[in-house]
Regions:
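Extreme N-terminal leader/targeting segments of oxidoreductases
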Residues: 1-25, 43-51, 550-591
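Glycine-rich FAD pyrophosphate-binding loop
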Residues: 42-70
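Short, glycine/acidic-rich hinge or "gate" loops at secondary-structure transitions
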Residues: 104-111, 528-538
Length: 591
């Protein structure tokens, strides 16, 4: 497996891999990453579809990319996906996945046309004082010292950040700035999360720094991700004859590890409560989704809280990874990520408006008609003075194909589930859907005498508790996550957010899909490059632009410095003023 860039490799079709007709594949899970791997197995690996098996412990595919209407409960989306135009693997695959809505076009075509016609932008990124604009006004609010802290992290070697927290590298000024408000709520970072991952994010998305305040850097699907992404992939795979095995838990995978060679030998299954075993040869490839950010998720209801379940059940992704990791040090250290759910949980809720009474409060903040079919909030609106640090969003409506006319379906989440609310004096984790809606309505500016009635009769709110949703953000070191294909591995790979691949960042659709592509390309030795992570961190134009944007447009020549430094800088500027370098510095407002 090797990385490539440019359209020479991107547009090429690889030859059929040697002996692929003799091989079979077994994939743990049916989340985005497993579906991606399966798609690459049949598209580029040209493996027979009937040789590809996906094991799903539940009755519905999709993993974390959900979007369902549960009978008697209502619409539920555990999360949302923020996409980027440089998700290179994602678009490499979705150009080949047919739309299930429009004949003759791909999922990428649909997505591209939609976001060209209706580009995303937020008209109100944050509120405070019960629905008033917080007037962050597109500013980061960083001093030169704060900017230097961020720059220092950007250039710090990875090994110096192992097991360090964000509070080890940022001081109170940065953590109290608009920059951190935008960043932590957009990506769900907590102050105690990994400084290494924070650095990787800065480098990965340096080209989007200017788009953080108004979220114009983001792209969104038309509907929820289950209907817009997962269902087209399922249909594509079913068209190849790929086999889905539902209600099938993978309870263990047994390996032979000796003399530098590692081989998966047996898959242990629990199929409808009956134990089964699949014996493996070197031609049987196993793709393992280890861990899982939505494991142990629990769904509440309008009148019921979502329970906090921290037990690692058999067949659970964490239990499976622990059993696998015990067999070889190269298989990672799951305990680094799943041992403290108080540090890794947060809650979300799906709000469905049932009549028109809440709509004006939404419209007052987003400054758009929510029923227009176009962008509504343009990404999350963060409630800056919320005790739960609530953020909420309404994407293009309808969010579900079967959504009744006149209803809106939105999503909110709170980073602090253990803190009493501002209006509802209970921790978010103890609240029913109605109570969470009441807290949200309070922050929208609904008059207090009307709040309970609106929450009860004008909305249906379904809470979800996710104990391990940010487990991958916990401080880590090299080796805590296994490589996608560990050294010496013969017939297996690790997939998803808890597999290690260079330069990309977790908690993104792209990271999952990238590990799926890398796994397939490595094990089948496919003769085509995997698109490298977008290289903006090496592009001097993006670096110059980000440096000025972080300073809210102030040129770097305006930095506070001693007179001798300013004198020397002036001399340098004079020398380069009429050169290409000088023009570049002027174009990006460095001078």
């Amino acid at each position: 497996m090797y990385y490539s860039s440019g359209n020479y490799e991107a547009f090429a079709r690889p030859r059929k891999p040697k002996d692929v007709d003799r091989k079979s594949a077994y994939l743990v899970g049916t989340g985005l990453v497993a579906l991606t791997a399966a798609c690459y197995l049949v598209r580029d690996g040209q493996m027979k579809g009937e040789h590809v098996h996906l094991f799903e412990k539940g009755a519905i595919p999709g993993g974390a990319c959900d979007g369902y209407q549960y009978p008697g409960i209502g619409y539920v989306m555990r999360g949302g996906r923020e996409m980027d135009d440089h998700f290179e693997v994602m678009w490499d695959l979705f150009r080949s996945i047919p739309s299930i809505e429009t004949e003759g076009v791909s999922v990428l075509d649909e997505y591209y046309w939609l976001n060209k016609k209706d580009p995303n932008v937020s008209l109100c990124r944050a509120t405070e004082q019960q629905g008033r604009d917080a007037h962050t006004d597109g500013r980061f609010g960083l001093s030169d010292r704060g900017c230097m802290e961020i720059m220092k992290l950007f250039f710090t070697p990875d090994e110096q950040l192992y097991d360090k927290r964000i509070t080890d590298v940022f001081d109170a000024e940065v953590l109290g700035s608009n920059f951190w408000l935008y960043w932590r709520t957009m990506f769900a970072f907590e102050n105690w999360h990994s400084a290494l991952e924070m650095k990787l994010y800065l480098k990965r998305y340096v080209h989007h720094v200017g788009g953080l305040p108004d979220l114009r850097a983001l792209r969104f699907t038309k509907y929820n991700q289950y209907e817009s992404m997962i269902l087209p992939m399922i249909r594509y795979l079913e068209g190849y004859g790929v086999r889905f095995h539902y209600n099938t838990k993978v309870t263990n995978i047994e390996f032979d590890c000796a003399d530098g060679k590692k081989q998966a030998r047996t898959i242990c299954l629990l199929v409808d409560d009956h134990e089964e075993r699949v014996d493996l040869t070197e031609n049987d490839l196993v793709f393992i989704t280890n861990g899982g950010c939505v494991e142990n998720s629990s769904i509440g209801a309008q009148d019921q809280p979502a329970a906090l379940d921290t037990v690692l059940h058999p067949g659970n992704g964490w239990d499976l990874w622990k059993k696998i990791a015990a067999q070889d040090p190269a298989f990672g250290h799951p305990e680094k990520f799943c041992s403290d759910p108080e540090q890794t949980n947060w809650m979300s809720a799906t709000v469905t408006t049932l009549d028109e009474r809440i709509v004006p409060y939404i419209q007052n903040i987003c400054k758009r008609d929510p029923f227009s079919g176009g962008v509504v909030t343009g990404g999350i609106v963060t409630i800056r003075d919320s005790n739960w640090l609530l953020s909420w969003t309404f994407n293009r409506q309808p969010q579900f194909r079967n959504q009744p006319k006149g209803q809106l379906v939105g999503w909110l989440y709170g980073l602090f589930s253990d803190t009493p609310g501002n209006y509802v004096k209970k921790p978010m984790r103890d609240c029913t859907g109605k109570e969470i809606c009441m807290e949200w309505l309070y922050h929208l500016g609904v008059p207090e005498p009307e709040i309970e009635d609106l929450a009860e009769h004008s909305a249906n709110t379904v809470p979800v508790m996710m104990p391990y949703i940010t487990a991958f953000f916990m401080p880590r070191a090299a080796g805590d996550r296994p490589a996608v294909v560990p050294e010496g591995a013969v017939n297996f790979a690790f997939l998803g957010q808890f597999a290690e691949t260079p330069r990309d960042t977790i908690f993104t659709t792209e990271y999952s899909m990238r590990t799926g592509m890398e796994a397939v390309y490595t094990l089948l030795d496919i003769d085509r490059g995997v698109p490298e992570v977008w290289g903006s961190t090496y592009d001097v134009r993006d670096l110059l632009n980000a440096a000025v944007q972080l300073r809210d447009g102030r040129p770097l020549s305006d930095l506070k410095m001693r007179w001798i430094e300013r004198f020397a800088l002036g001399k340098v500027i004079d020398r380069v003023q009429e050169t290409d370098l000088g023009r570049l510095l002027q174009e990006y407002k460095i001078i």
